[in-house]
Amino acid sequence: MIARNQRTRVAVVYGGRSSEHAISCVSAGSILRNLDPERFDVVAVGITPDGSWVLTDGRPETLAITDGRLPEVSAESGTALALPADPGRRGELVSLSPAPAGEVLAAVDVVFPVLHGPYGEDGTIQGLLELAGVPYVGAGVLASAAGMDKEFTKKLLVAEGLPVGDHVVLRPGRANVTLDERERLGLPVFVKPARGGSSIGVSRVSDWAELPAAIEAARRHDPKVIVEAGIAGRELECGVLEYPDGRVDASTIGEIRVAGVRGREDGFYDFATKYLDDGAELDVPAKVEDDVADEIRRLAIRAFRAIDCQGLARVDFFLTDDGPVVNEINTMPGFTTISMYPRMWAASGVDYPTLLAAMVDTAVARGTGLR
């Protein structure tokens, strides 16, 4: 299909049904601004909070946080469309309204699913794209699902001999942590939706009396909750990138510092600190010894491979007195103007347009189907 013209046509898909809808929009705005127009013909597709797909004008300025207001895709943002799950119509974006319904609005070569959270980063849209035979940026169905679910991420990491923090999983119907588990976890603990991100629904619990409210807050976003032991250590991150030839590389290390910054003493990198109030210091590169940085890069690639990831990921660590501990794997990390993933690659000598081009080229080279 790419022979149709000299530029690869990329559908940037954003928004979605998860509580991370707004952050997906912001990430998409940054990507739309930085995809090389000499190489890529870009189509912007928004997904509303209730799941409707619309062809939008893709203006980055409409996808920014402005005066604390979060962006959102609405049905009025553009023309309603669908992507048929039919390899015979590969890459066609078909009009649903207005008439004539069924008109092909655009045909794309590859999809860049800039979707964070459930119904996007969890293998669901990846499965649709596999059915439709359309190449896509990022992890496949298995790695997306495993990376989204903190319980199964940890299971796979442990199976590969990688260090993870202690935790307890609360499935639907279970509303508390036993006395033995409390003794084992200690305080503080962090209570999180098991399948969520951007610190939405996350609470720091420093007294067990606070636990029921924290579980309730997490369950507003996911019926499955994970309670993680607080880990004393520095918060470090590393980007992983796969190239079209299958080579996998790890970026310069970054560090997030919250405790003591602008009066914050709890060290909690929450949603507001990430996106609204400039309440964290982001150090890229992190001030760590070379041997520590090398070890974290090795562990990041091992974690990437442990969940059978493809394309890209950001791996989050705690650096403790006993060494690094893997916290999470993000198979579609944030791409906002302050996001660590593009900043770490920029510090590694890979600028933003080059980074995005590598991701798209890798997706096209990989294709779809069993591999």
From Swiss-Prot:
- The yes or no answer to whether the keyword Cell inner membrane is present is no
Record GO cellular component, one term: cytosol
Which residues of this UniProt protein bind Mg(2+) 1?
D316, E328
Q: Which Pfam families match?
A: Dala_Dala_lig_C, Dala_Dala_lig_N
At the top of the EC hierarchy, this enzyme's class is ligase
Q: Where along this sequence does the record place binding of Mg(2+) 2?
A: E328, N330
User: What sequence ranges are listed for the domain ATP-grasp?
Assistant: 154-361
Cofactor detail note: Binds 2 magnesium or manganese ions per subunit.
Q: Which PROSITE patterns did the record assign?
A: ATP_GRASP, DALA_DALA_LIGASE_1, DALA_DALA_LIGASE_2
Report the superkingdom from the record.
Bacteria
Chaperone found in the keyword field: no
- BP GO annotations: cell wall organization; peptidoglycan biosynthetic process; regulation of cell shape
Stated EC number for the protein is 6.3.2.4
Arranged from A to Z, the UniProt key words for this protein are: ATP-binding, Cell shape, Cell wall biogenesis/degradation, Cytoplasm, Ligase, Magnesium, Manganese, Metal-binding, Nucleotide-binding, Peptidoglycan synthesis
Q: Which cofactor does it need?
A: Mg(2+); Mn(2+)
Q: Where does this protein act, in terms of pathway? A: Cell wall biogenesis; peptidoglycan biosynthesis
| Protein family per UniProt | Belongs to the D-alanine--D-alanine ligase family.
Matching entries from HAMAP family are given as: Dala_Dala_lig
Q: Which PANTHER family match?
A: D-ALANINE--D-ALANINE LIGASE (PTHR23132), D-ALANINE--D-ALANINE LIGASE A (PTHR23132:SF25)
What is the protein's given name? D-alanine--D-alanine ligase
Originating organism:
Mycobacterium sp. (strain JLS)
